[in-house]
Amino acid sequence: PFTDVPADTELYAAVKWAYFSAPQITVGVTETTFAPASTCTRAEVVTFLYRLAGEPDVSGTALPFTDVAADAYYADAVKWAVANGVTSGTSATTFSPNDTCTRAQAVTLLYNAAGAPAVSDTVSFADVAADAYYANAVAWAAANGVTAGTSATTFSPDDACTRGQIVCMLYRGDTQA
């Protein structure tokens, strides 16, 4: 449905899946563009995961972060993410919703949303230390086809996660992992 997503790509299948899912995981940035190369914020990624989970009821759930307004579009998603161990924020009192979500953060949020399954594989990327907070998440994602590196030997954990990357990760995680 978007002019900037070629029909003969995996991205097209992922965007179509996210756009037509119920509840709808994401929409375009305009009626005709998806902006797959645009970066995602932490609020956007958590919101996509919350929608993928079916937007469960979070009424009565406390919002522990001072930087998330109760009426923010992502407030329920953040409540859900905290209550389900998907995130603990960037500190005890902040979530940093408008910060760009890195590839390491995105894959960790997906991994936690999947229940942080046991990982038997080791990380095969030179830029992912075995003791990095995201090492198990990267190993799980690579082993299950959720995401690959930015090259055969690098994952680029500190790079910004794009809209195209997160939608493909969600699609693969939901249909393959």
Predicted segments with their positions:
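Feature responds to low-complexity, polar/acidic, surface-exposed segments characteristic
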Residues: 1-12, 25-76, 88-104, 112-135, ...
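Glycine-centered, phosphate/nucleic-acid-interacting loop/turn motifs that mediate DNA/RNA or nucleotide
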Residues: 22-24, 85, 145
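A short amphipathic alpha-helical interaction element
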Residues: 15-18, 49, 78-81, 110, ...
